Amino acid sequence: MKTQRFLLLILFTALLLVFTGCSQSPEAKESPKEKAQTQKVSSASASKKNDLPTIKILATGGTIAGKSKTSTTEYKAGVVGVESLIEAVPEMKDIANVSGEQVVNVGSTNIDNKTLLKLGKRVSKLLSSKDVNGIVVTHGTDTLEETAYFLNLTVKSDKPIVVVGSMRPSTAISADGPSNLYNAVKVAGAHEAKGKGTLVVLNDRIASARYVTKTNTTATDTFKSEEMGYIGTIADDIYFHNEITRKHTKDSEFSISSLDKLPQVDILYGYQNDGSYLFDAAVKAGAKGIVFAGSGNGSLSDAAEKGAVRAVKKGVTVVRSTRTGDGVVTSNGDYVKNDLLASNSLNPQKARILLMLALTKTDDPRKIQDYFNEY
Ligand code: ASP
């Protein structure tokens, strides 16, 4: 009898243990704090796909963030925020983990040196994190090449940096922004895009910031790299077909980490009957450097040359570029003797970017000419 009661007790205890063990869920065994952490981790891992690259989109405004009724020329640039840009292209989530930051929201004619420095520092900071694989900057097309070249010279990273814009506002029929943005994210997440410096992606083409320029006021195929060529194409897949021969990004000598301003560099344009007073006015207004968009191979009229030489004598660095839109400006003759430097193949607006950065390091004309030959 005693043994029977003892066996029954053991059976009852065993049943109780089994029952309580089964009914207790794993969560019930955790403290509320642990439970919250578990949920957070699992919800994060549900939305984040670990095998996809992590891309940050830094938005600055422009037509890609513009709105109109249906017009492609009358619209307000820089009104749509970065979250709306991302929401408009949900397909991006299949190719990358994307998130956005609004740096500024302006038409690109209002991008100034302060914004360049802010953007450059932010891109550098983000890329220094092991959690970020690439950066996309959305930007107005008017001065896009200047910002792209600035990043090309100042961000010390070999991770992809892609600058993108659009020629039609987000509300236009057949807006080009969504597909350009999708392609930009695709390129920024591509392993093959590493080490190529800052890239510009529009209209299914990949261009180097060093070589590309805007060539047409309104057409969607406005960004061209006539002389040097595009470096790649996007036809669903990415096809790279050219290498960059100029120094950039992690091989660049220019650093902005401790800068809060850039030296004033102005651009003057050469034309028939121009005068030397243009140079005097720039010097008086505080220019430390002047880029001259000369005719042909960076030529100056006699009057302009007098003004340029006067500026050089006052310690201002003068660089000859060209208004032709393409080709190399060579160092030759009296121009060299008078320390009028040559922009090599940089157009005036990009020569200004390089000259600003060069002047943060030196005012030696020979050294600055070397920079123009190397970058
Ligand atoms: N005006 C515009 C801008 O540069 C043009 C564009 O984005 O295409 O912001």
What do these predicted regions represent?
Residues M1-I10:
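Bacterial N-terminal signal peptides that target proteins for export
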Residues T20-G21:
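C-terminal motif of bacterial Sec signal peptides marking the signal peptidase cleavage site
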Residues E34-K35, Q39-S124, K306:
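ATP/NTP phosphate-donor binding region
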Residues S43-A44, K49, Y277, D302-Y375:
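ATP/nucleoside-binding phosphotransfer catalytic cores, i.e., glycine-rich phosphate-binding loops
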Residues L52, L58, A65-S68, G81, ...:
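Accessory alpha-helical/coil subdomains and C-terminal extensions
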Residues V137-K159, L300-V309:
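Short Gly/Thr/Asp-enriched flexible loops that form oxyanion-binding sites at enzyme active sites
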Residues A148-P178, V185-G189, K313-T322:
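Short, acidic/small-residue loops that bind anionic groups at enzyme active sites
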Residues V164-A235:
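Internal gly/pro-rich beta-alpha loop/helix module
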